[in-house]
Structures are given as structure tokens and as C-alpha cells.
């Protein structure tokens, strides 16, 4: 993890696409280390969902950087000129789609149904789908995905999706 961060700081953050994947892998590393440190088994589902969600958010954030660069000429990142909005919209759409499908597969997997003793977990997919679509709207229409934390704290629709997901 430390070597990956050093490589990222020195060179990899300058490489388009690689930079975003490194960020997502970093979240997976933290998840694995946390699981190991606490003695909690980390399922392949949580690893996959963590990676995909981090990738989705990182691409959305990069898109915000691109829009800022195109509007002001200010580079938030060195590699911002290696991306464009059309490419980012495609990448975000692909990752969002894969994330949703993966989550639905998770909710209907035998392992998860048995673990939670419920055949109705798939209902939570409604809130995941709505939340991701709303985040796409915030990213593409509102152009306000520069800070995922700020979106989470301020967007009532996304907050309601999270509450609905937790309740179901």
C-alpha cells in the first residue's frame, strides 16, 4: 500500500485511467487491512463493490476537474488534458452500470440470502439504483461532483436513498 502510494505520488497520478484505478485499489487495500486488523472476514462482494463504487466516484470527480479545466484553463491535475467530458461520461456510465448489476447479483446470491436469512434483499436495489442515477444527475447535469462528501452531506435525495437502503 505504501509503495503504491509512493508510485502514485511520483508518477502514476500523471497517467490517465491508471490514476483513477489506483485510487479505487487504495480503498480496497484499506478495506482488507481493516478486515485483517479486526479479524473480520471480507467477502468478495464487499471487495468488488468497494472497488466499483470508488472507481465510479473517482471518475465523477475527474469529470468535475475536466469541466473546471475547460471553463477556466486551470488544471486541478496534471493529466486532466488526457481526458475529456465525453470519455468521462462513457466511463462513468459503464462503471455505474456494472456497479448496479454487481449489486443486484449480490442481493440474489445464495450466500447472501442465507447470511441475512432473507430472500428480499433485492428490494434494496431500488435505492441503490435511485442513488446512483441521482449521483449521475449531480455529476452530469448539475456539474457538482467535485466533492463526493459534500454531495452526500447536502443532497437530500441521496440521503433518502441511503436511509431507504438501510431500512429495507
Where are these regions (language model features)?
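C-terminal membrane-associated helical module and adjoining short loops/tails
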Residues: 10-15, 21, 28-168
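Internal transmembrane alpha-helices of multipass membrane proteins
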Residues: 1-8
Amino acid at each position: 500500500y505504501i509503495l503504491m502510494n509512493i508510485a502514485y505520488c511520483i508518477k502514476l497520478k500523471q497517467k490517465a485511467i491508471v490514476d483513477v484505478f489506483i485510487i479505487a485499489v487504495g480503498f480496497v487495500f484499506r478495506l482488507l487491512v481493516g478486515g485483517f486488523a479486526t479479524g473480520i472476514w471480507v467477502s468478495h462482494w464487499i471487495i468488488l463493490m468497494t472497488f466499483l463504487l470508488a472507481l465510479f466516484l473517482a471518475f465523477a470527480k475527474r469529470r468535475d476537474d475536466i469541466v473546471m479545466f475547460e471553463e477556466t484553463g486551470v488544471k486541478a491535475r496534471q493529466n486532466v488534458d488526457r481526458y475529456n467530458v465525453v470519455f468521462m461520461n462513457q466511463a462513468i456510465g459503464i462503471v455505474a452500470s456494472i456497479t448496479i448489476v454487481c449489486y443486484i447479483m449480490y442481493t440474489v446470491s445464495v450466500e447472501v440470502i442465507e447470511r441475512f436469512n432473507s430472500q428480499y434483499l433485492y428490494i434494496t436495489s431500488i435505492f441503490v439504483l435511485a442513488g446512483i442515477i441521482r449521483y449521475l444527475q449531480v455529476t452530469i447535469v448539475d456539474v457538482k461532483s467535485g466533492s463526493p462528501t459534500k454531495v452526500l452531506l447536502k443532497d437530500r435525495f441521496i440521503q433518502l436513498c441511503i436511509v431507504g437502503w438501510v431500512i429495507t
